[in-house]
Regions:
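Alpha-helix boundary/capping detector
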Residues: 88, 153-154, 165, 169, ...
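Catalytic cores of RNA-modifying enzymes
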Residues: 1-122, 126-129, 159, 179, ...
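Secondary-structure transition/capping residues
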Residues: 49, 70-73, 150, 154, ...
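An accessory alpha-helical subdomain
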Residues: 104, 108-110, 116-154, 161-164, ...
């Protein structure tokens, strides 16, 4: 198959291939500049497994835990849909010609029950992106800003969800982002 991976109808390609398999996998050494769109597309299509060679820094962002410097929207977005693992790094010298960056192999196992239903993923990702775009603000102020709700309403929701009002987006686990997003709708 040749073509633009971002424009390919993956399901149709699989159904009309000689393999016609139900439990298909995505494996690849992908162009680093389109890593995020490829991962988002692959997760939307729900293969049994995704294994990709990506830039090492991107791998770190995908698998990051709350509180780390690399934790952000990419981490949350991937982790609400899949179990993510960084398997190993690949040095630049492993390639000819060697790239200017190190690489890593990541594995994403799509969750049988993702924390966000597939049709809602774009709205959830937009919510998370808005939270991280105001990274230095407290969640209380972020939620007031993006929902236009009064402080007392936001405070009550944070208390009900067990989120400290002074917490910042980079400290929140993916499950809490899902809860806040559901409240904000």
């Amino acid at each position: 198959m040749t073509g633009d991976v971002l424009r390919l109808d993956w399901r149709s390609a699989i159904l009309h291939s000689a393999f016609n398999i139900l439990h298909w996998k995505v494996l690849g050494n992908i162009p680093y500049y389109i890593t995020t769109p490829i991962i988002e597309l692959a997760l939307r299509e729900r293969p049994a497994l995704i294994v990709l060679l990506v830039q090492d820094e991107v791998a770190d962002r995908i698998v990051s835990a709350p509180g780390s410097k690399t934790y952000g929207g990419l981490s949350v977005g991937a982790q609400v849909e899949a179990q993510v693992e960084k398997l190993f790094t690949v040095k630049a010298g492993s390639f000819t010609p060697p790239p200017k960056v190190h690489s890593a192999v990541i594995r994403l196992r799509p969750l049988l029950r993702p924390l966000v239903a597939p049709p809602d993923v774009p709205a959830f990702r937009a919510f998370v992106a808005a939270c991280f775009s105001l990274r230095r603000k407290t969640l209380r102020n972020v939620l007031r800003s993006i929902t236009s709700r009064p402080a007392e309403v936001v405070d009550a929701a944070l208390a009900e969800l067990g989120v400290e009002p002074r917490a910042r987006a980079e400290t929140l686990v993916p499950e809490r982002f899902v809860a806040l997003w559901r409240w904000s709708r």
